[in-house]
């Protein structure tokens, strides 16, 4: 067949398609800015509203969520540093609202996706740890330095998943504390997914709020993401505003506040230490201490009351003995005034 001199070649067609795509790629902001102007003739800045993905959270609510997770990041920095016995730094990189589909597309595959039940709220959330951080944590807990990650593209083994499960459960306790001002959140670990496509907790078009945390463990840097669907926190979304916080400031001390304070104090862990005795040693003796060395205490301590400390305060006298096959102490008397532990009673009297 003879070539038609007026026909377009394949290269011409490809060039036309490319030019059309490039013109369509211009943002709507740029297009509107070229046609909309003020009465004075100056161009006005126009904000685009996408009806396919309407904002569910106001800027004020996003800022409130950000402040909660700044506290969460501080708590997590402390808990992970203690767990890994290595300097860990966690901070909030961004808080955005987007569709669930966009979130799923933005994370690597494989990764570590923990499905979280957000009791007492209905629905689930996702806590994602990217492979770089997950393998650094696992390597450190297995005795490594956590800085050398050979293969980040593989799935976690069953043992490694079990280790990450315990770490995530530890982190979730920090989340409960961070959200305690608006809800008594009791996040419960559900299960781990490694393929984001299998973690369908809401429809793809559902709006979520995404908290991205930058994490540094020694020399390793990576991300953690907390995905919270709007339908999950919809019952408390009205509390994520300054109006709600101002109303709390005006309430003052009430029986409800005292109940919350009482619950906090009653669930606060306090160390109790029974001092068996003390030994004075010279510095050179301390430096030479080794496994198997014996420190001689007073023989009279066996029948002598010991001091029981609550925190750093001496509060009770006790006597050492056995309960079953365990060494135990029995409280024999209170030491002085324990009024410092009766704060709740004083507060209750003030309200009355």
UniProtKB/Swiss-Prot annotation:
Location (main, coarse): membrane
Source organism superkingdom: Bacteria
Cystine residue pairs: none
Cellular component annotations (GO), alphabetically ordered: bacterial-type flagellum basal body; plasma membrane
Alphabetical keyword list: Bacterial flagellum, Cell inner membrane, Cell membrane, Chemotaxis, Flagellar rotation, Membrane
Signal peptide positions (record): none
Gene Ontology biological-process annotations: bacterial-type flagellum-dependent swarming motility; positive chemotaxis
GO molecular function, one term: cytoskeletal motor activity
Pfam family, one: FliM
Protein's cellular compartments: Cell inner membrane; Bacterial flagellum basal body
Membrane topology value: Peripheral membrane protein
Homology family: Belongs to the FliM family.
Function field: FliM is one of three proteins (FliG, FliN, FliM) that forms the rotor-mounted switch complex (C ring), located at the base of the basal body. This complex interacts with the CheY and CheZ chemotaxis proteins, in addition to contacting components of the motor that determine the direction of flagellar rotation.
Official protein name in the record: Flagellar motor switch protein FliM
Organism: Borreliella burgdorferi (strain ATCC 35210 / DSM 4680 / CIP 102532 / B31) (Borrelia burgdorferi)
């Amino acid at each position: 067949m003879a070539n038609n001199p007026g026909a377009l070649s394949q290269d011409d067609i490809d060039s036309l398609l490319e030019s059309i795509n490039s013109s369509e790629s211009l943002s709507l902001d740029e297009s509107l800015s070229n046609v909309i102007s003020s009465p004075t003739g100056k161009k006005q800045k126009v904000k685009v509203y996408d009806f396919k993905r309407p904002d569910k959270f106001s800027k004020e609510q996003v800022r409130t969520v950000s402040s909660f997770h700044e506290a969460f990041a501080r708590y997590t920095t402390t808990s992970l540093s203690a767990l890994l016995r290595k300097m860990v730094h966690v901070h909030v990189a961004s808080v955005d609202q987007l569709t669930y589909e966009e979130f799923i597309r933005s994370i690597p595959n494989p990764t570590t996706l923990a499905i979280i039940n957000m009791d007492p709220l209905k629905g689930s959330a996702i806590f994602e740890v990217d492979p770089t951080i997950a393998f650094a944590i696992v390597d450190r807990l297995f005795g490594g330095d956590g800085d050398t990650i050979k293969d980040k593209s593989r799935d976690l083994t069953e043992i490694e998943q079990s280790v990450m499960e315990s770490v995530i459960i530890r982190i979730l306790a920090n989340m409960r504390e961070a959200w305690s001002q608006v809800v008594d959140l009791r996040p419960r670990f559900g299960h781990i997914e490694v393929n984001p496509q299998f973690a369908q907790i809401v429809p793809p078009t559902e709006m979520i709020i995404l908290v991205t945390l930058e994490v540094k463990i020694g020399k390793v840097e990576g991300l953690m993401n907390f995905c919270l669907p709007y339908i999950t926190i919809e019952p408390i979304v009205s509390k994520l505003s300054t109006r709600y916080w101002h109303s709390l400031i005006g309430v003052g001390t009430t029986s409800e506040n005292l109940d919350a304070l009482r619950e906090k104090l009653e669930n606060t862990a306090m160390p109790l230490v029974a001092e068996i005795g003390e030994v004075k040693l010279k510095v050179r003796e301390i430096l030479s201490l080794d496994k198997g060395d014996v420190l001689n205490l007073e023989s009279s301590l066996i029948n002598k009351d010991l001091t029981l400390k609550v925190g750093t305060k001496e509060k009770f006298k006790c006597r050492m003995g056995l309960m079953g096959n365990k060494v135990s102490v029995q409280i024999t008397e209170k030491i002085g005034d324990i009024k410092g532990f009766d704060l709740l009673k004083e507060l209750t009297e003030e309200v009355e």
